[in-house]
Amino acid sequence: MNTLLVTGTSTDVGKTVVTAALTALARAEALPVAVCKPAQTGVAPGEPGDLAEVRRLAGPVPTLELARYPEPLAPDTAARRCGAPLLTLDETATAVRGLDAELTVVEGAGGLLVRIGEFTLLDLARELDAPVLVVAAAGLGTLNHTELTIRALDAAGVRCAGVVIGAWPAEPDLASVCNREDLPRLTGVPIVGAVPAGVGAWDHDRFTAAVPGWFAPGWSPRLPFNSDSPPSTWGFDTSQSGT
């Protein structure tokens, strides 16, 4: 079993839509895939959460949510406020390993060092010896946030599977266009995908048909980028639109 963890440079950068896109891409390659969201926050019991959105966009796949907290806060804060037990690293890693799939995609909460329980996504990546895909914003601030995230991965000895722009605008401003060129140069990690802004509102058929065009040719979630390899420049189509 291969595991790929998905983190963001911050909250609301498009992790769930990127997770759905990765899942759809794996399904298009006939790769058995499962998705885990260790902790869901800001959603009441019985309401659809991020995993429901992944299934809606990517299609029926096995999913696993280990904990849910009603307040939209960092998972450990939300757990403490409602008196729920904190997730542990051991139980989470065991649950991920127990999923019956050739590829398991694990979506974190917020950024790399947000506490999911008694641990962070970085801790989980080290425990699973799994690479991490970084979802970044397109505009101002992303150079600093992305480089900080990748430096934290490097310092911990965790492989980076690449950077994906989580919401590429239909009409990118100058900062976004410059960031597209500067991110690989500054981080040493290639941009392996760019998901158009707004595609999370699409239906399943439209979403899955478009997914292959959002990732670099030849890149696959089953073959994550090795950070020891030289970065490449992918000239993704900046005219893509999620409208």
UniProtKB/Swiss-Prot annotation:
Instruction: Kindly tell me the pathway this chain contributes to.
Output: Cofactor biosynthesis; biotin biosynthesis; biotin from 7,8-diaminononanoate: step 1/2
**Entry GO MF terms:** ATP binding; dethiobiotin synthase activity; magnesium ion binding
Which GO biological process entries does UniProt record here? biotin biosynthetic process
Q: Which Pfam families match?
A: AAA_26
Statement: the UniProt record of this protein carries the keyword Glycosyltransferase: no
Q: What is its main location?
A: cytoplasm
User: Which cofactor is recorded for it?
Assistant: Mg(2+)
Record GO cellular component, one term: cytosol
What InterPro entries does the annotation carry?
A: DTB_synth_BioD (IPR004472), P-loop_NTPase (IPR027417)
Which cellular compartments is it found in?
A: Cytoplasm
What residues make up the catalytic site?
A: K37
Q: Where does ATP bind?
A: D12, V13, G14, K15, T16, V17, D50, E107, G108, A109, G110, P196, A197, G198
Keywords (A to Z) from UniProt: ATP-binding, Biotin biosynthesis, Cytoplasm, Ligase, Magnesium, Metal-binding, Nucleotide-binding
Residues reported in the UniProt entry to bind substrate: T41
Disulfide-linked positions: none
Q: Where does Mg(2+) bind?
A: T16, D50, E107
The UniProt record lists the EC number as: 6.3.3.3
Recorded catalytic activity of this chain's protein: (7R,8S)-7,8-diammoniononanoate + CO2 + ATP = (4R,5S)-dethiobiotin + ADP + phosphate + 3 H(+)
Q: What class of enzyme is it?
A: ligase
The task this protein performs is described as:
Catalyzes a mechanistically unusual reaction, the ATP-dependent insertion of CO2 between the N7 and N8 nitrogen atoms of 7,8-diaminopelargonic acid (DAPA, also called 7,8-diammoniononanoate) to form a ureido ring.
Q: How does it assemble?
A: Homodimer.
The family annotation for this protein states:
Belongs to the dethiobiotin synthetase family.
What is the protein name given in its UniProt record? ATP-dependent dethiobiotin synthetase BioD
The organism is: Nocardia farcinica (strain IFM 10152)
